[in-house]
């Protein structure tokens, strides 16, 4: 069984179910789950990528969020022992994504494609052997919650809902106090 999700319509592929939608939207994930009817997948491959802005830090942050979202989706539709592959950009927060993946798969590796330009930060995360349940390091959190916690721990602002948090100036995503 092959299920494809894309924002844009593509030519039909014999034997495949193609869903036109945003893989980060609940309605699209619901369509996938309804099609699966409780069946689980062996492999999830994602080449999700942001619409590039030309600002590396912004593109990398959006790529991290997209890859983490797809990791959470994959964990929900993969059978134990399954494999997840995603493309992301190397940079701030990537270790949080790798750690979240390691809590859900027994083998996690990063690869930079040899066909990619030397200056490219494109990397693939290959996650093999999905565990029946997440390791204790996940502490019941989603991958997105783990990555958000990782970003907070390294001083990156991920949300501004905490009225107690004193943030004087925001530059990109890193919070700076007036003293810096």
How should these model regions be labeled?
Residues 11-19, 44, 56-136:
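C-terminal substrate-binding/active-site "lid" region of AdoMet-derived donor-dependent transferases
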Residues 14, 25, 33-37, 65, ...:
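Glutamate identity and glutamate-enriched acidic tracts
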Residues 32-39, 47-51, 74-79, 115-119, ...:
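Short C-terminal domain-edge/linker segments immediately following a structured domain
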Residues 118-180:
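SAM/dcSAM-binding transferase cores
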